[in-house]
C-alpha cells in the first residue's frame, strides 16, 4: 500500500497497519500502513527542503496553484463527498456542502492574506516604513474526523498561501478523505515536498508533534488533546501553536411567537451532523412555565421523527451515523451517567447495533442534576435546563470552562443586546443555529475552546509573522548628528 505522500511521491508506511470503517455498515473504507517515526522524520525533512523554493515563489504563482486546487475540488465534488460520507457516516447532502466550503475557502484565504497580512508601506522622513509578512517555515497540521476535508483545509490553504510548507496528519478515522484531498493538491501542481501526508494513529501523531524541526502546529480536535499540546509546547515559545477545540455550547430559548421556528433552529443547533460539530448546542435553556412546556413537547415530537440512515440512502436522512460504534456507545454511557445523577430522559438514546454508529437524537432534562459536569458530549445528546429568569439562564450558560459558541432565540431585541454583552463565547448568534458560521468571520472561542481563529479569513494571522523595516534607497549622512558624534 502506498498511502503516505512524502516529497511528491506516494510511498508505503513502515508503521503498523490500521483501517477506517464506514460507521453505518462496518465495511472497511480504507486500510494501509501507518507512518513510523522514521517516516515522519522524512516528511518533515522533505518539507524543510521545499520551504526555500516555495516561500521564494511569487505570491501570484502560489495563488495560481491554490486556485487550481479549488477548481479541481469543484470538478470532483461528488467523488470527494462520497469519500467523506463513507468514512464519517454523514449524509451525502451534507458531505457535498463540505466540499463546496473547501473550495470557497480559497478565494477568502487569498483576500485575507492581502488585506490582513501582505505588504504595506508608509512614507517617513528620509525613507519609508514597510510592513511585510514572512512564513514560519514547516508547519504540522492535525485534522479532525468530523469535517476531514473542510477543517484541515482551513489550516492548509492559508499556510500554503503564506509560503509555509506542511506536514499533514489527518484523523485515523478518516484517512481516505485525506488521501483524496492530497491527490487533488498533487494534480493542481503543488511542488514536491510542499505538502506531505503522514497517515497513522496515536504514535504517528506523537512523532509529528514532538519533532524538533517543525515551526508551527495547527490543530483542530478535542479540548483534551489540545490541552496536552498546549502543555507540551509551554516551554517552546518558538513554536506557533494554533488550537481550535470543542465547546459545551448553550442555546437559550425565549418566549417566541413562532414556536416551530424555535424548534427548527434548536434541532439544527443540537443534531446537525449527528451533533458532531464543535459548535453544536449541548445545553438547551428552556423557560419554566406554559411556553416552556409547549416548546419541549414540540421539540420532542419533531425530534422523535428524525431517522438516521446510511450516508447514501435514498431518500436522504437528516442524520447519519456518528463516527464509530465506540463513539455511539460512549454517548449512551454518558446518558446513563447523567441519569444516575438525577437527569430525566425525555427521548432516550439507544444504539441501534453494537457494531455500528447509529444512535437516535435524544433529549434529557438535566435541571435536577447538582454540579452538572462541564463536558462536551460529541453527538446528538441535547441536555435541557429549565430556568426561571433570563439572568439565571445567562449565568448558567456562562458556567463553563469552554467558550466556543452560544445562541439566543428571542423576539426581544433588548434581550439580545443584554445577551451579546454578557455571554462569554467567540461565536454568538441571534435567531440562528449555534453552528451557523461564516468563513469571512472569526471562527473560534475562549477558554478551553482554543487560542486562535482558524477560519479562512483570520487564519492568515497565525500563518505568517510580521516583519517591520525602515528603508531608504540612498545611503546618506544625516544633516543633524546626535550629540557627541564628530564627522
Swiss-Prot record:
The keyword Oxidoreductase applies. Keywords: Arginine metabolism, NAD, Oxidoreductase. The keyword NAD applies. The lineage of its organism: Bacteria, Pseudomonadati, Pseudomonadota, Betaproteobacteria, Burkholderiales. It comes from Burkholderia ambifaria (strain MC40-6). This is N-succinylglutamate 5-semialdehyde dehydrogenase. One of its GO terms (molecular function) is succinylglutamate-semialdehyde dehydrogenase activity. Belongs to the aldehyde dehydrogenase family. AstD subfamily. InterPro entries: Ald_DH/histidinol_DH, Ald_DH_C, Ald_DH_CS_CYS, Ald_DH_CS_GLU, Ald_DH_N, Aldehyde_DH_dom, SuccinylGlu_semiald_DH_AstD. GO terms for biological process: arginine catabolic process to glutamate; arginine catabolic process to succinate. Pathway: Amino-acid degradation; L-arginine degradation via AST pathway; L-glutamate and succinate from L-arginine: step 4/5. Catalyzes the NAD-dependent reduction of succinylglutamate semialdehyde into succinylglutamate.
Amino acid at each position: 500500500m502506498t498511502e503516505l505522500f512524502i516529497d511528491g511521491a506516494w510511498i508505503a508506511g513502515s508503521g503498523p497497519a490500521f483501517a477506517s470503517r464506514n460507521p453505518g455498515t462496518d465495511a472497511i473504507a480504507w486500510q494501509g500502513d501507518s507512518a513510523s517515526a522514521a517516516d515522519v522524520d522524512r516528511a518533515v525533512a522533505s518539507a524543510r527542503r521545499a520551504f526555500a523554493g516555495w516561500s521564494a515563489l511569487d505570491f501570484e504563482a502560489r495563488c495560481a496553484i491554490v486556485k487550481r486546487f479549488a477548481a479541481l475540488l469543484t470538478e470532483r465534488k461528488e467523488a470527494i463527498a462520497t469519500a467523506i460520507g463513507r468514512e464519517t457516516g454523514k449524509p451525502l447532502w451534507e458531505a457535498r456542502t463540505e466540499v463546496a466550503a473547501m473550495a470557497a475557502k480559497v478565494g477568502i484565504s487569498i483576500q485575507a492574506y492581502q488585506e490582513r497580512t501582505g505588504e504595506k508601506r508608509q512614507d517617513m522622513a528620509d525613507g519609508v516604513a514597510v510592513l511585510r509578512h514572512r512564513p514560519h517555515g514547516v508547519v504540522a497540521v492535525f485534522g479532525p474526523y468530523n469535517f476531514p476535508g473542510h477543517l484541515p483545509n482551513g489550516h492548509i490553504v492559508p499556510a500554503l498561501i503564506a509560503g509555509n510548507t506542511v506536514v499533514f496528519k489527518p484523523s485515523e478515522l478518516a484517512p481516505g478523505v485525506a488521501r483524496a484531498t492530497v491527490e487533488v493538491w498533487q494534480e493542481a501542481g503543488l511542488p514536491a515536498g510542499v505538502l506531505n501526508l503522514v497517515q497513522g494513529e496515536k504514535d504517528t501523531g506523537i512523532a509529528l508533534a514532538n519533532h524538533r524541526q517543525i515551526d508551527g502546529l495547527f490543530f483542530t480536535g478535542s479540548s483534551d488533546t489540545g490541552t496536552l499540546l498546549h502543555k507540551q509546547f509551554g516551554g517552546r515559545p518558538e513554536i506557533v501553536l494554533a488550537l481550535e477545540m470543542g465547546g459545551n455550547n448553550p442555546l437559550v430559548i425565549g418566549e417566541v411567537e413562532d414556536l416551530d421556528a424555535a424548534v427548527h433552529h434548536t434541532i439544527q443547533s443540537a443534531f446537525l451532523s449527528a451533533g458532531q460539530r464543535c459548535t453544536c448546542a449541548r445545553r438547551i435553556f428552556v423557560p419554566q412555565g406554559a411556553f416552556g412546556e409547549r416548546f419541549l413537547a414540540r421539540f420532542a415530537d419533531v425530534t422523535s421523527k428524525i431517522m438516521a440512515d446510511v450516508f447514501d440512502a435514498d431518500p436522504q436522512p437528516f442524520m447519519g451515523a456518528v463516527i464509530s460504534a465506540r463513539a455511539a456507545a460512549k454517548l449512551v454511557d454518558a446518558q446513563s451517567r447523567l441519569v444516575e445523577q438525577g437527569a430525566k430522559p425525555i427521548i432516550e438514546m439507544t444504539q441501534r447495533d453494537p457494531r455500528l454508529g447509529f444512535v437516535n437524537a435524544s433529549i434529557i432534562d438535566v435541571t435536577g442534576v447538582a454540579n452538572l459536569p462541564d463536558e462536551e458530549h460529541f453527538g446528538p445528546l441535547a441536555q435541557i435546563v429549565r430556568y426561571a429568569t433570563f439572568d439565571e439562564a445567562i449565568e448558567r450558560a456562562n458556567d463553563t470552562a469552554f467558550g466556543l459558541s452560544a445562541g439566543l432565540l428571542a423576539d426581544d431585541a433588548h434581550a439580545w443586546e443584554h445577551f451579546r454583552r454578557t455571554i462569554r463565547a467567540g461565536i454568538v448568534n441571534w435567531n440562528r443555529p449555534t453552528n451557523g458560521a461564516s468563513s469571512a468571520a472569526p471562527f473560534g472561542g475562549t477558554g478551553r475552546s482554543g487560542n486562535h481563529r482558524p477560519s479562512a479569513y483570520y487564519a492568515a494571522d497565525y500563518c505568517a509573522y510580521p516583519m517591520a523595516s525602515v528603508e531608504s534607497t540612498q545611503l546618506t549622512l544625516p544633516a543633524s548628528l546626535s550629540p557627541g558624534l564628530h564627522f
